[in-house]
């Protein structure tokens, strides 16, 4: 249940690894608790 839980624009979390959120809150613990913070593709 990460949907609606992410309210950040940049994710710098490298401790989570799954696939649920496109961003992760500060601390990468709320949304990351079972999901993953994917860093925005800087293209």
UniProtKB/Swiss-Prot annotation:
<feature type="binding site">
    <location>
        <position position="21"/>
    </location>
    <ligand>
        <name>a divalent metal cation 4</name>
    </ligand>
</feature>
<feature type="binding site">
    <location>
        <position position="8"/>
    </location>
    <ligand>
        <name>a divalent metal cation 1</name>
    </ligand>
</feature>
<feature type="binding site">
    <location>
        <position position="37"/>
    </location>
    <ligand>
        <name>a divalent metal cation 7</name>
    </ligand>
</feature>
<feature type="binding site">
    <location>
        <position position="37"/>
    </location>
    <ligand>
        <name>a divalent metal cation 5</name>
    </ligand>
</feature>
<dbReference type="GO" id="GO:0006882">
    <property type="term" value="P:intracellular zinc ion homeostasis"/>
</dbReference>
<feature type="region of interest" description="Alpha">
    <location>
        <begin position="17"/>
        <end position="43"/>
    </location>
</feature>
<dbReference type="InterPro" id="IPR017854">
    <property type="entry name" value="Metalthion_dom_sf"/>
</dbReference>
<dbReference type="GO" id="GO:0046872">
    <property type="term" value="F:metal ion binding"/>
</dbReference>
<dbReference type="GO" id="GO:0071294">
    <property type="term" value="P:cellular response to zinc ion"/>
</dbReference>
<feature type="binding site">
    <location>
        <position position="23"/>
    </location>
    <ligand>
        <name>a divalent metal cation 5</name>
    </ligand>
</feature>
<feature type="binding site">
    <location>
        <position position="21"/>
    </location>
    <ligand>
        <name>a divalent metal cation 5</name>
    </ligand>
</feature>
<feature type="binding site">
    <location>
        <position position="11"/>
    </location>
    <ligand>
        <name>a divalent metal cation 1</name>
    </ligand>
</feature>
<dbReference type="InterPro" id="IPR023587">
    <property type="entry name" value="Metalthion_dom_sf_vert"/>
</dbReference>
<feature type="binding site">
    <location>
        <position position="31"/>
    </location>
    <ligand>
        <name>a divalent metal cation 4</name>
    </ligand>
</feature>
<feature type="binding site">
    <location>
        <position position="20"/>
    </location>
    <ligand>
        <name>a divalent metal cation 4</name>
    </ligand>
</feature>
<feature type="binding site">
    <location>
        <position position="28"/>
    </location>
    <ligand>
        <name>a divalent metal cation 6</name>
    </ligand>
</feature>
<feature type="binding site">
    <location>
        <position position="24"/>
    </location>
    <ligand>
        <name>a divalent metal cation 6</name>
    </ligand>
</feature>
<dbReference type="GO" id="GO:0071280">
    <property type="term" value="P:cellular response to copper ion"/>
</dbReference>
<comment type="similarity">
    <text>Belongs to the metallothionein superfamily. Type 1 family.</text>
</comment>
<dbReference type="GO" id="GO:0010273">
    <property type="term" value="P:detoxification of copper ion"/>
</dbReference>
<feature type="binding site">
    <location>
        <position position="24"/>
    </location>
    <ligand>
        <name>a divalent metal cation 5</name>
    </ligand>
</feature>
<feature type="binding site">
    <location>
        <position position="11"/>
    </location>
    <ligand>
        <name>a divalent metal cation 3</name>
    </ligand>
</feature>
<protein>
    <recommendedName>
        <fullName>Metallothionein A</fullName>
    </recommendedName>
</protein>
<keyword id="KW-0480">Metal-thiolate cluster</keyword>
<feature type="binding site">
    <location>
        <position position="16"/>
    </location>
    <ligand>
        <name>a divalent metal cation 3</name>
    </ligand>
</feature>
<dbReference type="GO" id="GO:0071276">
    <property type="term" value="P:cellular response to cadmium ion"/>
</dbReference>
<dbReference type="InterPro" id="IPR000006">
    <property type="entry name" value="Metalthion_vert"/>
</dbReference>
<feature type="binding site">
    <location>
        <position position="2"/>
    </location>
    <ligand>
        <name>a divalent metal cation 2</name>
    </ligand>
</feature>
<feature type="binding site">
    <location>
        <position position="6"/>
    </location>
    <ligand>
        <name>a divalent metal cation 3</name>
    </ligand>
</feature>
<comment type="function">
    <text>Metallothioneins have a high content of cysteine residues that bind various heavy metals.</text>
</comment>
<feature type="region of interest" description="Beta">
    <location>
        <begin position="1"/>
        <end position="16"/>
    </location>
</feature>
<dbReference type="GO" id="GO:0005634">
    <property type="term" value="C:nucleus"/>
</dbReference>
<feature type="binding site">
    <location>
        <position position="2"/>
    </location>
    <ligand>
        <name>a divalent metal cation 3</name>
    </ligand>
</feature>
<feature type="binding site">
    <location>
        <position position="31"/>
    </location>
    <ligand>
        <name>a divalent metal cation 6</name>
    </ligand>
</feature>
<feature type="binding site">
    <location>
        <position position="13"/>
    </location>
    <ligand>
        <name>a divalent metal cation 2</name>
    </ligand>
</feature>
<feature type="binding site">
    <location>
        <position position="35"/>
    </location>
    <ligand>
        <name>a divalent metal cation 4</name>
    </ligand>
</feature>
<dbReference type="Pfam" id="PF00131">
    <property type="entry name" value="Metallothio"/>
</dbReference>
<keyword id="KW-0479">Metal-binding</keyword>
<dbReference type="GO" id="GO:0005737">
    <property type="term" value="C:cytoplasm"/>
</dbReference>
